[in-house]
Swiss-Prot record:
Family annotation (PROSITE patterns): FKBP_PPIASE
Domain notes: Consists of 3 domains; the N-terminus binds the ribosome, the middle domain has PPIase activity, while the C-terminus has intrinsic chaperone activity on its own.
Organism: Shewanella sp. (strain W3-18-1)
SUPFAM superfamilies linked: FKBP-like, Triger factor/SurA peptide-binding domain-like, Trigger factor ribosome-binding domain
Entry keywords, A to Z: Cell cycle, Cell division, Chaperone, Cytoplasm, Isomerase, Rotamase
Main location as per UniProt: cytoplasm
An example Gene Ontology CC term for this record: cytoplasm
Domain of life the protein comes from: Bacteria
Catalytic activity: [protein]-peptidylproline (omega=180) = [protein]-peptidylproline (omega=0)
Protein name: Trigger factor
Subcellular location: Cytoplasm
InterPro entries from the UniProt entry: PPIase_dom_sf, PPIase_FKBP_dom, Trig_fac, Trigger_fac_C, Trigger_fac_C_sf, Trigger_fac_ribosome-bd_bac, Trigger_fac_ribosome-bd_sf, Trigger_fact/SurA_dom_sf
Length: 434
């Protein structure tokens, strides 16, 4: 086998490989003979079909298969010999064939050489937060509101009330599509409606008819309504006030607490809040570390890896539509290219961090991650056992653990400053509620 390597552009490489022609001819001949022994063709006894007949019928297909196998096998031998690391499947182009040799070309991309830079320039503001008694009480208050019952009242509507109404919206005196409703139910303070709508309901009683003036936001989804001034003629039919459950052992029982009553509920709430806080703190720091790593390291990315990631993201997006992908048009690659490229770059950079620091997934960390995730379920032991018995899930958790270890390794050289933050403020930002 003779091999020549050509760097065409960027990460693309072109291998020209020559193998003795007799290698292919022998393989074709052997394959034809095997086929002749097992072929069943009318007019010939089993196992007695002449090779010439087999060659006439199947020779072209057999030669094509053999050629493909020879190209694949010799390609693998060539990249090993040349110490090349393909980032995707090669494209084979069969070339000339004569009595002496068979020549073909393999084109593919290689992984980039990654040299980590600027690790000591990564800046991280590490948030420090804890769950206080006041945070637990605030969560209990939220749970009370979620389990509130509502009853009609004969007073002015206030924040937190539920109201029922009929309304008709108009712009420049003309009703618009989607601007009319009957028996519409709304909780005041929920922020469901456009700015000014809920505020216009406050202070009115059931049975009143009134008009409120609002402006549609510039970013409103309907093009014909963006930034437009509108009027809503409203008939308020009912005002309902919330009746919150008392915070006692009966309240705790609503959440499956059979022993320990209210104190047991508070303990469980604190545990869940601590788990969510720990996850959010880790995610916040990781996001900053990754951002710094990306900013300080510009590397060329193999198109093959980006294309593969685009396909993954596209499939995930299709599944979010309910899995009904059969009759859906394929989503354009452009929708996912930027995100795919970012994920590929992160993977390559973190891979180099793992390699440089000789990191291996720590079993204790893997089991800790599984236990933390399982604690959110009714029977954690069942979830833990399931993960430990599933090779694919365990590999996923090892990857998560390795990523954590890589981030921790980067933190050692980063410029880290700590900042005390309140639980509610931090979690609101983390969940996008701020």
């Amino acid at each position: 086998m003779q091999v020549s390597v050509e760097a065409t552009q960027g990460l693309e490489r072109r291998l020209t490989i020559s193998v003795p022609a007799e290698q292919i001819e022998k393989l074709v001949k052997d394959s034809l003979q095997r086929e002749a022994k097992r072929a069943r063709i009318p007019g010939f006894r089993p196992g007695k079909v002449p090779v010439t007949v087999i060659n006439k019928r199947y020779g072209a297909a057999i030669r094509q298969d053999i050629t493909g196998e020879v190209m694949q096998r010799n390609f693998i031998e060539a990249i090993i010999a040349e110490k090349l690391n393909p980032a995707g499947a090669p494209t084979f182009i069969p070339g000339s064939t004569d009595s002496e040799k068979f020549e073909f070309v393999a084109t593919f991309e290689i992984y980039p050489e990654v040299e980590l830079k600027g690790l000591d320039a990564i800046e991280v503001e590490q948030p420090k937060a804890s769950v206080t008694d006041a945070d637990v009480d605030s969560m209990i208050e939220t749970l009370r509101k979620q389990h509130a019952t509502y009853a009609a009242v004969e007073r002015e509507a206030a924040d937190g009330d539920k109201v029922k109404m009929n309304f008709v919206g108009s712009v420049d005196g003309e009703e618009f599509e989607g601007g009319k409703a009957e028996d519409f139910e709304l909780q005041l303070g929920s922020g469901r409606m456009i700015p000014g709508f809920e505020a216009g309901i406050l202070g009115h009683k059931a049975g009143e008819e009134f008009v409120i003036d609002v402006n549609f936001p510039e970013e409103y989804h309907a093009e014909n309504l963006k930034g437009k001034a509108a009027k809503f003629a409203i008939t308020l039919t009912e005002v309902q006030a919330a009746n919150l459950p008392e915070v006692n052992d009966e309240f705790a029982a609503l959440f499956g607490i059979s022993e320990g009553g209210l104190e047991a509920l508070k303990t469980e709430i604190r545990k869940n809040m601590n788990r969510e806080l720990e996850q959010a703190l880790k995610a916040n720091v990781k996001e900053q570390v990754i951002a710094g790593l990306l900013a300080n390291n510009d590397i060329e990315l193999p198109k093959a890896l980006i294309d593969g990631e685009v396909n993954v993201l596209r499939q995930q997006a299709m599944q979010r539509f309910g899995g009904q992908t059969a009759n859906m048009p394929e989503l354009p690659a452009e929708l996912f290219t930027e995100q795919a490229a970012r994920r590929v770059k992160i993977g390559l950079l973190l891979g180099e961090v793992i390699k440089t620091n000789e990191l291996k997934a720590e079993d204790e960390r893997v089991q800790g991650l599984i236990a933390s995730m399982a604690s959110a379920y009714e029977d954690p032991s069942e979830v833990i056992a399931y993960y430990n018995s599933n090779k694919e899930l365990m590999q996923n958790m090892r990857n998560v653990a390795l990523e954590e270890q890589a981030v921790e390794a980067l933190l050692k050289s980063a410029k880290v400053t700590e900042k005390e933050v309140a639980f509610e403020e931090f979690m609101n930002k983390a969940t996008g509620r701020a």
